Regions:
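Membrane-helix interface/capping segments
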Residues: 58-80, 100-108
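Alpha-helical transmembrane segments
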Residues: 8-25
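Membrane-proximal helix-loop-helix units in multi-pass membrane proteins
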Residues: 91-136, 144
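Alpha-helical transmembrane segments of polytopic membrane proteins
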Residues: 43-55, 82, 121-129
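Transmembrane alpha-helical segments of multi-pass membrane proteins
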Residues: 75-94, 155-163
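Membrane-interface alpha-helices
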Residues: 171-191
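Membrane-interface helix-boundary motifs at transmembrane edges
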Residues: 35-41, 67-80, 144-151
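Hydrophobic, aromatic-rich membrane-embedded alpha-helical segments
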Residues: 156-176
Length: 191
């Protein structure tokens, strides 16, 4: 009995590692950039692949464990990732806005550098969003199969998991709807 509790609680390590990896990516890039000044043999290109690697780990966990993860656990994993990455995307959006505003400085080269930085940060952010999607898509599909959410809402929710800001809004809506469904199920069970 204790082994199942440990196994079920261990699933939460994966989204926490994903969130930590996303937050540590800029720090590791900065540290490797500082180390590169002192030695030429340090490559920081692998750090940019971190969202892809962590996203593949998320996908592998969801595909391998599949039915062993409950709907509630999938929702908690989704909420951990989506809610914890709100400050990350907020700061990324601010950096993009600053990069785009730098286009209007009198330095001519910034006309080209500002949009390049903005596009690069947007791609990294979207890859992070893509890497966070396996848990949320698995939750939405499972909830639809169990009758918690309708098919139309589920289709829209899956589509919007790949758009900034709307993904978090849909996770909030789905979590509230799941809570209401769970309360209704408890009432029916008690009667």
């Amino acid at each position: 009995m204790n082994e199942t509790k440990k196994a079920s609680g261990a699933i939460y390590i994966v989204p926490i590692v994903y969130v930590l990896g996303m937050y540590l990516m800029p720090v590791v890039l900065w540290v490797l950039g500082s180390a590169k000044e002192s030695a030429d043999n340090v490559s920081s290109a692998w750090v940019l692949a971190l969202p892809i690697i962590l996203g593949l780990v998320n996908l592998a966990v969801v595909l391998i464990l599949g039915e062993k993860i409950s709907r509630g656990q999938l929702l908690i994993c989704t909420r951990i990732i989506k809610y914890a990455l709100i400050p990350f995307y907020f700061l990324g959006g601010l950096c993009i806005a600053v990069a785009l505003l730098l286009m209007f400085t009198p330095v001519v080269i910034m006309v080209f550098v500002g949009p390049a930085i903005a596009v690069s940060l947007s791609v990294i952010g979207w890859l992070g969003l893509l890497g966070a999607a396996p848990f949320s898509v698995a939750y939405i599909v499972r909830a639809c199969k169990e009758g918690v959410h309708g098919k139309a809402l589920s289709v829209f929710a899956v589509i919007f998991q790949f758009f900034f800001s709307v993904d978090v809004i849909f996770v909030i809506i789905l979590a509230i709807k799941d809570r209401v469904y769970s309360k209704q199920q408890k009432r029916q069970y008690m009667q």
